[in-house]
Curated annotation (Swiss-Prot):
One of its GO terms (cellular component) is cytoplasm. It comes from Shewanella sp. (strain MR-7). Its EC number is 2.1.1.67. CDD domains: AdoMet_MTases (cd02440). This is Thiopurine S-methyltransferase.
Length: 218
């Protein structure tokens, strides 16, 4: 996916991937990670996700990375969070006391920024990449995460031929095959969410499963 694709989506506000509510899997399973309240938590390709507010409410220091500037600005504006902005290398750094968002390319994000994170949360990042680029992203995520860090991965799976992504279909087999070198993987839950996604229903996609995994960086 070229950067221009995502910039155009945000500019036109064609952001069906943005959830209006906190992800139920996050609420149900986050405590499974048993992270201390003051843990630093990394959220890749964070957009303006309300899930970051949930993480901050747990006491965590949230570190996000997002390509699009408008998404970052809208996060702070819509949640009425006064923020400061500064340049940090190739990225723009928007931050409050608890939330630090780095606007720019995740593939050039310095490892020093995530060196002290102990948790991570990926709901919309892995599924944003077509299969041809997904492995590259997964390796970059692994490089950014310290050994021993734990997180939740949320995926969607459906017959890919039924609909062109994003979001792209990520099967349990793909997760096991491509992530097991860098992560210990535990499948926590999987449920059919087709009825909650009108776009998939309209395109007559026969099934749509949302799954959540606990990942631990080796």
């Amino acid at each position: 996916m070229e950067p221009g694709f995502w910039h155009e989506k945000w500019q036109q506000q064609l952001i069906g991937f943005h959830q209006q509510d906190i992800n139920p899997f996050l609420v149900k399973y986050w405590q499974t990670l048993a992270l201390p309240a003051d843990a630093k938590v990394f959220v890749p390709l964070c957009g303006k996700s309300l899930d970051m507010c949930f993480l901050a409410e747990q006491g965590h220091q949230v570190i996000g990375c997002e390509l699009n500037e408008l998404a970052v600005q809208q996060f702070f504006e819509e949640n009425q969070l006064p923020m400061k902005k500064s340049a940090e290398g190739e990225h723009q750094h928007y931050h409050t006391e608890q939330v630090s968002l780095y606007q720019g390319d995740i593939f050039t994000l310095p490892q020093s920024i995530t060196a002290k994170v102990s948790g991570f949360y990926d709901r919309a990042a892995l599924i944003a990449w077509p299969e041809s680029m997904r492995t590259q992203y997964a390796k970059q995520l692994a490089q950014l995460l310290p050994s021993g860090s734990v997180g939740l991965l949320v995926t969607l799976d459906y017959p890919q031929e039924a609909l062109s992504g994003p979001p792209f279909a990520v099967s349990p087999t793909w997760v096991e095959t491509h992530l097991s070198d860098d992560f210990e993987i535990q499948a926590l839950a999987c449920q059919d969410v087709l009825a909650d996604n009108p776009r998939f229903v309209k395109k007559e996609v026969p099934w749509l499963n949302e799954a959540v995994y606990l990942l631990r960086r080796k």
